[in-house]
Amino acid sequence: MYSALAALVLALLLTSCSQPDGRIAKSAHQLLEQGKLQQAQESLQDGFRQFPQSIALRQERLHLNLLAGQPELAAAEAQQILQTQPSAQPYRLPLRDPSPAIRSLAIRAFALAPPQHPSPLSVLRTALRDPDPTVRRESIEATRILTPTQATPLLRQATQDSDWLTRASAARLLGNRADPSAIPALFSMLQDKDSYVRRFARRSLLELSTLAKPDAYLPALQSKDRTTQVVAALALARLNDGRGLDILLAEMANPLGIERIECVKSAVRIQDPRVLPAVRAATSDQDSQVRMVALIALGLLQDKESAPLMKKIQSDASAPQEVRLAAGKALELLSQPTPK
């Protein structure tokens, strides 16, 4: 593909070389190919003094800006080209450049000020099939310029990408898109082999919970995977739905449960007589962070019966300082008037 591109570049240059600005552009292009960026820049500056509106020179300066890692300047150059010649395609060659770094930066520049032709959707769809993961990741980030209807299929496609960073980006952006229809795909990503991907899938699932109906999370409560169950229960609790409470309480009582802190925070949203005893028990958790959260939660719940426990923890010299401080704060909360 890239050998064909080289031939295309050569043909375009030969065609333009019949013009004086074309010859300067060709010379600058050769310098860029040789890595002589400073000399190429000087050549282009000389050319612009003679031909300030030259598209050929602007195209080479766009290339120079990409090589210099300055997509913002490249985007500005592309806009200048399009103002002079609206039918031009300033990104056609950069998007086919042999260098993945240039293709990636071209996508970034394209997204800063996307032209109408070719369509942004077609450009990003093609970039998502690029053999280099850097380019695919950049194309996923650039889906912000698309409508939700256009972006969601590309993001879901990226959840299956061979590159874990691309999958993680897709998981994060599915949450940012605020589209509850992505919930099933995100639940499947909780099984991803990479922890970074799983972390972003979890975060997006919880972010989407405020936009979704409980029914979107209920099937996951029946999953054989414990992580899937817990995340579904956390999401339901954010909707003040207690149908996952048993799972939250079990996770809080599990010394190896990695979601104990979040389960304490979520369980207190549910009006259920089993919650207070479970939160009280969490004040003796082996993890000081869990104990702190549980103490503050009891204070916020105005659990007067826990006052002796709080005082005991506050005066316990063997307890970590942050836990004693949390107990003191919980006692302060108990002394405050009960919200009506």
Can you say where each PLM-predicted feature lies in the sequence?
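N-terminal leader/linker segments that initiate helical-solenoid repeat arrays
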Residues: 14-89
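Short inter-helical turns and helix N-cap capping residues of alpha-solenoid HEAT/ARM repeat scaffolds
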Residues: 98-99, 131-132, 162-163, 193-194, ...
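Alpha-solenoid helical repeat scaffolds
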Residues: 56-60, 90-93, 137-141, 172, ...
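Core register positions within helices of long alpha-helical scaffolds
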Residues: 64, 77-80, 109-112, 142-145, ...
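Bacterial N-terminal signal peptides
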Residues: 6-15
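Amphipathic alpha-helical scaffolding segments comprising HEAT/armadillo-like alpha-solenoid repeats
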Residues: 41-42, 53-59, 72-75, 83-95, ...
